[in-house]
Amino acid sequence: MTGPTTNTKNDLMIVNMGPQHPSMHGVLRLIVTLDGEDVIDCEPILGYLHRGMEKIAENRTIVQYLPYVTRWDYLATMFTEAITVNAPEQLGNIQVPQRASYIRVIMLELSRIASHLLWLGPFMADIGAQTPFFYIFRERELIYDLFEAATGMRMMHNYFRIGGVAADLPYGWIDKCLDFCDYFLTGIDEYEKLITRNPIFLERVEGIGIISGEEAINWGLSGPMLRASGISWDLRKVDQYECYNEFDWEVQWQKEGDSLARYLVRMSEMRESIKIIQQALEGIPGGPYENLEVRRFDKTKDSEWNDFEYRFISKKPSPNFELSKQELYVRVEAPKGELGIFLIGDQNVFPWRWKIRPPGFINLQILPQLVKRMKLADIMTILGSIDIIMGEVDR
């Protein structure tokens, strides 16, 4: 008589997470292979939010394309607008007035804070802390009030223009923004008291999703993902675009490379952004907010009384100019990392090629490696610490 046979083969389970899972930060689908609660494999499935943004750019002038770009990373729209106008400005050698450059820096840093706040709330909710999720909307609402006063829109601002910005800052806006800066610093202190030394929070994030500096460089990571791994690299210091070199601020970085380090980098970055905004507001120069030279047009023929074009004689056309026949790569330091554009001009008002380098897409590549041999619950922590928006990942 023989005893019962034991099956030594592990029974693996395949679980679909997403594309409508509440912790997926958009329409991301993960096919996860589990052995009990241990993650054996993870395959991200992308493309649910693909809208052909690069192809649309090839059939639009730069000014026509500006409203589209705010739909890439719809939580940090100032950065997508900035990269869209910076590329043709460099291609056409267009000078930006000093006042416009200061206004741009203020808007970019406010947008960085808003993006980091809306990362912090859902990240904390993912790992079980609901309270900060409601707190972050107080400060974020104040930032959106500032955006609405200056641009007319709370989101999707369409504020940047080639050679400057669409409108000057309204009366009283600078004082209102300075008041917000003072208030927000107390808000960050409150968040850090609530979160940073909370033992349950530390259990969930410390030592989870570790990336070494060498790995971060090899995978092409950027932004807080790179700086949390011991690499002090920030394009605002490296490239010195706009007028960042005129302000006193420090690159924030950590050396541990885990989810806690990425949290600490983003929290410190918000403090540095406030420092930059305060210096820009206090030192903002006078002068024009746009370069009117860009708005020159070729002289059109005089319309006759019975001509079809006569009815459009009072319409103001959008400014166009030819993109010279050359290649150019332009980049900015967005909240999630290096946002870049590879632009090819072809003596036409339309770009011949408009390649987008989204930081979220590159940073997401390392997710399968990070979650292997981790617990199922750690997927939420690691994915949240990467900070992705599917609008820019899928484009």
Curated annotation (Swiss-Prot):
It holds the Pfam family Complex1_49kDa. Disulfide bonds: none annotated. Keywords: Chloroplast, Membrane, NAD, NADP, Plastid, Plastoquinone, Quinone, Thylakoid, Translocase, Transport. GO terms for biological process: photosynthesis, light reaction. It is found in: Plastid, Chloroplast thylakoid membrane. It comes from the Eukaryota. Coiled coil: none annotated. It is a peripheral membrane protein. GO terms for cellular component: chloroplast thylakoid membrane. PROSITE patterns: COMPLEX1_49K. It catalyses: a plastoquinone + NADH + (n+1) H(+)(in) = a plastoquinol + NAD(+) + n H(+)(out); a plastoquinone + NADPH + (n+1) H(+)(in) = a plastoquinol + NADP(+) + n H(+)(out). SUPFAM superfamilies: HydB/Nqo4-like (SSF56762). Its main location: plastid. Its EC number is 7.1.1.-. One of its GO terms (molecular function) is oxidoreductase activity, acting on NAD(P)H, quinone or similar compound as acceptor. NDH is composed of at least 16 different subunits, 5 of which are encoded in the nucleus. Belongs to the complex I 49 kDa subunit family. HAMAP family: NDH1_NuoD (MF_01358). NDH shuttles electrons from NAD(P)H:plastoquinone, via FMN and iron-sulfur (Fe-S) centers, to quinones in the photosynthetic chain and possibly in a chloroplast respiratory chain. The immediate electron acceptor for the enzyme in this species is believed to be plastoquinone. Couples the redox reaction to proton translocation, and thus conserves the redox energy in a proton gradient. PANTHER family: NADH DEHYDROGENASE [UBIQUINONE] IRON-SULFUR PROTEIN 2, MITOCHONDRIAL, NADH-UBIQUINONE OXIDOREDUCTASE 49 KDA SUBUNIT. This is NAD(P)H-quinone oxidoreductase subunit H, chloroplastic. It comes from Lemna minor (Common duckweed).
